[in-house]
Amino acid sequence: MAKKNSKPKAGSNTIALNKKARHEYFIEDEIEAGMELQGWEVKALRQGKANISESYVFMRDGEAFVSGMTITPLNQASTHVVANPTRVRKLLMSRRELDNLLGRINREGMTLAALSLYWARSWVKIKIGVAKGKKLHDKRDDIKDRDWQRQKARVMKSSLR
């Protein structure tokens, strides 16, 4: 009898990705943080009802918050709780990590971007990127490189036939 593989697939824990952030910014470093969520938000995230494409991270009073993230409430969510899909959510990080982030974003042109939202065991985690904005010519160079990689792959595929 064949042994079943109990390991989950690599991408199965991902809830949402922010592809726009990698296009708009140079990501220098990635940091993992927990999130302070309400019960209906966890249920909606289990259904994959999240969008982080317009989200950003900001610091206020030594704490980190994510804004612009949308978690669409489920239809059968609790009736006694008013669900605000775009509320500002607090990020859970150690004091050392928060101080490190604050020092890094105070430099010229640095910001924090939400990159992905995923499950780590039973906890929702968000991956934050310490980022620097791209200029238009940088974006064009990236597009040119991507097109060149596609063309190379096509040529290699056709030459193997």
Swiss-Prot record:
UniProt keyword Transferase present: no
CDD domains xref list: SmpB (cd09294)
Keyword Protein biosynthesis tagged: no
Gene3D superfamilies reported in the protein's UniProt record: 2.40.280.10
One Pfam match: SmpB
GO MF: RNA binding
UniProt cross-references to InterPro entries, sorted A to Z: SmpB, SsrA-bd_prot, SsrA-bd_prot_CS
GO cellular component: cytosol
GO terms under biological process: trans-translation
Superkingdom field: Bacteria
Physiological role: Required for rescue of stalled ribosomes mediated by trans-translation. Binds to transfer-messenger RNA (tmRNA), required for stable association of tmRNA with ribosomes. tmRNA and SmpB together mimic tRNA shape, replacing the anticodon stem-loop with SmpB. tmRNA is encoded by the ssrA gene; the 2 termini fold to resemble tRNA(Ala) and it encodes a 'tag peptide', a short internal open reading frame. During trans-translation Ala-aminoacylated tmRNA acts like a tRNA, entering the A-site of stalled ribosomes, displacing the stalled mRNA.
PANTHER family referenced in this protein's UniProt entry, alphabetically: SSRA-BINDING PROTEIN, TMRNA-BINDING COMPONENT OF TRANS-TRANSLATION TAGGING COMPLEX
Protein name per UniProt: SsrA-binding protein
Upper lineage: Bacteria, Pseudomonadati, Pseudomonadota, Gammaproteobacteria, Vibrionales
